[in-house]
């Protein structure tokens, strides 16, 4: 915001403020200033959760970077990022659903998210899906 904006009474919308906070949080995250990143991401989320995927914030809650571990919040943020088409979030959501991390266990839904992540060329999802298919084929030889 420049001097002219201040003089004319510039009013930032919630979405604009959220985007500014989100971008600053991402810079802090990449600089490994996790405590600051978490606070900025949460402020952005409160203003407008649709300004970004918030995938890095979910990582902070999972790994306890700049915050304490919070399985439910981590799941919520990961699901948000997956719905916004983030392949790594889709893979992580699959893991959470398959294990009940922060949510009710749902292996059928977990498999759907794993396949979606693999279709988006997420390498970890492709590997996990191949492993699962191999295991299923060993358990049911008719699949070979």
Each predicted region: which residue ranges?
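TPR-adjacent "capping" and linker segments in tetratricopeptide-repeat scaffold/adaptor proteins
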Residues: 3-20
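Short helix-capping/linker turns of helical repeat alpha-solenoids
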Residues: 16, 47-50, 63-65, 70, ...
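Alpha-helical segment of the N-proximal tetratricopeptide repeat
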Residues: 16-46
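Hydrophobic face of amphipathic alpha-helices that form TPR/SEL1-like repeat modules
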Residues: 24-27, 54-63, 92-99, 128-136
């Amino acid at each position: 915001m420049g001097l002219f904006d201040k003089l004319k009474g510039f009013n930032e919308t919630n979405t604009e403020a959220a985007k500014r906070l989100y971008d600053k949080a991402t810079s802090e995250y990449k600089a490994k200033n996790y405590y600051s990143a978490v606070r900025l991401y949460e402020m952005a989320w409160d203003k407008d959760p649709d300004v970004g995927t918030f995938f890095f914030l979910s990582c902070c809650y999972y790994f306890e970077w700049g915050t304490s571990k919070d399985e439910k919040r981590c799941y919520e943020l990961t699901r948000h990022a997956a719905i916004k088409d983030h392949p790594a979030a889709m893979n992580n959501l699959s893991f959470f659903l398959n294990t009940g991390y922060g949510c009710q266990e749902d292996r059928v839904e977990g498999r759907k998210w794993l396949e979606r992540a693999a279709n988006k060329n997420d390498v970890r999802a492709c590997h996990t899906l191949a492993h699962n298919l191999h295991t299923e084929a060993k358990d049911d030889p008719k699949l070979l």
